[in-house]
């Protein structure tokens, strides 16, 4: 049981032995540096050079242009190009805000926490660069409530950055000023949805706002123009400014640019977080290559895998050779989402796996929209009674029917009867598992137990949260 | 049980002053109350309402939405076992079962001596380190049953006091308001609000 010491991400540069695509580390370079999270450690390894360069030698538009040229796609889940998003800000409307989404909670996702714990100054530098580019005088850094170490490291980094005139009034002697205010949540997955995050920042219950407006760039925090960016997205900005948007664009495929962090968990020999060439690396590379996960545990085979977080449609062995490319994965009927790959081997009980993901959404539904609040709860109950051996012959049809009410047509990308995508996300695991492993559900209903040869879990918890209303 | 201490009022007012609108300070200030008492008391919520200039009902309305806020005392150590998909695949339920047996309580409850609370929680962003848990939001990775037993022993005999503060304390480093706080965002927003 290693102590509270996040493992280092493994880069793909150097020592490639199996012909996987390689590239430089952009944002994980300090993960192996013992003092990489401190001000001194950051500056010693080239930190804040991009900020100095931008503020003294580049106009805000020039910084924005570099980000546009890089075509960096947002790393939070939707994959929307950051430079385009910034362009949605209405001209001449101030104040405007930058909000950093550090509410990493999508099951399978583990990379923003690493970036916040191990390189907080890199994120802060990215926030100041973004604020300069769009003309924001205040930025909010919202960290997930459960991440105590990330909050500590960022608080210390902000105090040091202020003391060294890298944030605050007249940064580095220029006439640019911006404040960064550290805030944090208190346990609610839905706050990762950007309008819910804004509600939470305003001190409200974290419920998504009705759309339109579709982008907070029009009306966001305090109904002012607001850009919400993910931690990983902003952490890339110092590299882009130190090199160029074109350099970033040239690293990988034209439809998924730059390097990107992926967390691979589940039934692999060496689970880990890897910064790899985006768009050219394949799922199989990550799962099988010795420099990454080194294959499925115990020499077994892949039964299914989640390609982009719990909200994604599942993939199967025939998808392993797809590249980690947004356009390709979208076209294949799922998404790369938040860079979270969960591998399930051939001993996995698919009904149990499906139930666990659905339980997550049922528990995290904010309750604002009826189809999601009621629907996810019923989906969870039906799946749980199957697992408990009390499944009914009509249950499978009921599951699909409830799914239809949340996401009509069960298409991808999902249609929704809800304000935000949380409800439809609970449909993904059911559509995936029922379509492919219908016999496993039928077997549960008929025999009250899983098919032979799958691992059983000691599932017994309900919603075991202490003394909560 | 109590209102915020004088010290916590100073910290709270500092946070409130940094926000363009006072209510934005609500969640961080609720955490202060939980840090003081280990949970969020009714008195503290009334006090927070006064400090921010909203009603106690608004404070409770927000607080009750978020899972981390407790409205009754919990254990000195809250042990949160992740059972989400990556952890389930690698034995989280078995770990939770062991934790319940070892402490003699069910998930969601607290030992009679007030030392430990167990919760089964959703993904804590440590998926590659499954099965994972948090003690008062400090991580433990790839936890075996033996690891769990050693953890409980260490918590009981104080060996982890430096690393793991009592429940309620999150970050032990706070952002301070420096002399060069620009305050342009707040002033601009106040001008907008005044229109």
Model-predicted regions and their roles:
Chain A
Residues 119-133:
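Histidine-anchored nucleotide/phosphate-binding helix
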Residues 151-278:
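Hydrophobic alpha-helical positions that pack around
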Residues 11-64:
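Cofactor-/ligand-binding subdomain signature composed of acidic, glycine-rich
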Residues 42-49, 101-112, 218-221, 263-269:
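Gly-rich Lys/Arg/Thr-decorated short loops/hinges at beta-loop-alpha junctions or inter-strand turns
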Residues 68-89, 185-199, 203-205, 362-375, ...:
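Conserved phosphate/anionic-ligand binding catalytic regions in large, soluble enzymes, centered on
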Residues 78-79, 83-86, 109-112, 151-156, ...:
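Short acidic, glycine/serine/threonine-rich loops at helix termini
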Residues 126-130, 279-297:
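Short amphipathic, charge-patterned alpha-helical segments
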Residues 1, 5, 50-67, 94-98, ...:
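Ferredoxin-type iron-sulfur electron-transfer modules in oxidoreductases and energy-metabolism complexes
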């Amino acid at each position: 049981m290693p102590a509270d010491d996040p493992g280092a991400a493994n880069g793909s540069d150097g020592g490639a032995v199996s012909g996987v695509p390689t590239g430089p580390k952009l944002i994980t370079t300090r993960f192996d540096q013992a003092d990489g999270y401190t001000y001194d450690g950051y500056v010693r390894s080239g930190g804040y050079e991009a900020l100095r360069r931008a503020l003294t030698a580049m106009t805000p538009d020039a910084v924005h242009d570099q980000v546009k040229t890089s075509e960096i796609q947002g790393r939070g889940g939707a994959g929307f190009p950051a430079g385009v998003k910034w362009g949605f800000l209405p001209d001449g409307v101030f104040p405007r805000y930058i909000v950093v989404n550090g509410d990493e909670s999508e099951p399978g996702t583990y990379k923003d926490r690493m970036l916040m714990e191990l390189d907080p100054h890199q994120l802060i530098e990215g926030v100041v660069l973004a604020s300069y580019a769009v003309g924001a005088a205040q930025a909010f850094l919202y960290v997930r409530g459960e991440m105590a170490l990330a909050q500590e490291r960022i608080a210390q980094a902000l105090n040091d950055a202020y003391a060294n005139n890298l944030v605050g009034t007249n940064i580095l002697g220029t006439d640019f000023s911006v404040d960064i205010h550290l805030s944090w949540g208190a346990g609610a997955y839905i706050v990762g949805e950007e309008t819910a995050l804004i509600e939470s920042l305003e001190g409200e219950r974290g419920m998504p706002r009705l759309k339109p407006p579709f982008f907070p760039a029009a009306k966001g925090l305090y109904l002012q123009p607001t850009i919400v960016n993910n931690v990983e997205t902003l952490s890339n900005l110092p590299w882009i400014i130190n090199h160029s948007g074109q350099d970033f664009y040239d690293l990988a495929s034209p439809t998924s640019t730059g390097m990107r962090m992926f967390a691979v968990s589940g039934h692999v020999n060496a689970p880990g977080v890897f910064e790899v060439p985006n768009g050219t690396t394949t799922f199989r590379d990550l799962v099988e290559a010795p420099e990454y996960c080194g294959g499925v545990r115990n020499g077994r085979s892949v039964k299914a895998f989640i390609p982009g977080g719990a909200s994604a449609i599942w993939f199967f062995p025939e998808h392993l050779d797809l590249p980690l490319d947004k356009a390709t994965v979208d076209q294949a009927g799922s998404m790369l989402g938040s860079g979270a790959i969960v591998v399930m081997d051939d001993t996995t009980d698919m009904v149990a796996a499906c139930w666990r993901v659905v339980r997550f959404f049922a528990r995290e539904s904010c309750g604002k929209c009826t189809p999601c609040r009621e629907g996810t709860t019923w989906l969870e109950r039906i799946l749980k009674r199957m697992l408990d051996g009390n499944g009914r012959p009509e249950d499978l049809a009921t599951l699909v029917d409830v799914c239809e009410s949340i996401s009509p047509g069960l298409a991808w990308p999902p249609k929704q009867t809800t304000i935000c995508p949380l409800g439809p996300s609970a449909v993904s695991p059911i559509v995936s598992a029922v379509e492919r492993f219908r016999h496993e559900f039928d077997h549960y209903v008929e025999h009250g137990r899983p098919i032979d040869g799958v691992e059983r879990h000691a599932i017994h918890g309900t919603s075991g949260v202490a003394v909560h209303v | 049980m109590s209102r915020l201490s004088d010290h916590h009022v100073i910290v709270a007012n500092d946070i409130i002053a940094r926000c363009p609108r006072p209510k934005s300070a609500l969640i961080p200030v609720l955490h202060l109350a939980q840090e003081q008492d280990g949970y969020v008391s009714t008195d503290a919520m009334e006090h927070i309402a006064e400090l921010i200039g909203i009603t106690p009902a608004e404070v409770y309305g927000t607080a009750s939405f978020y899972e981390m806020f407790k409205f009754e005392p919990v254990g000195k150590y809250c042990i949160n076992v992740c059972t989400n998909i990556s952890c389930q695949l690698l034995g989280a339920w078995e770990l939770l079962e062991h934790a319940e047996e070892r402490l003699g309580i069910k998930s969601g409850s607290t030992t009679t001596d007030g030392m430990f609370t167990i919760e089964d929680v959703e993904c804590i962003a440590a998926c590659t380190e499954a099965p994972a848990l948090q003690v008062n939001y400090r991580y433990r990775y790839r936890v075996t049953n033996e690891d769990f037993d050693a953890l409980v022993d260490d918590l009981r005999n104080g060996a982890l006091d430096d690393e793991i503060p009592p429940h309620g304390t999150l970050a032990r480093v706070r952002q301070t308001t420096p002399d060069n706080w620009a305050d342009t965002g707040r002033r601009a927003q106040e001008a907008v609000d005044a229109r």
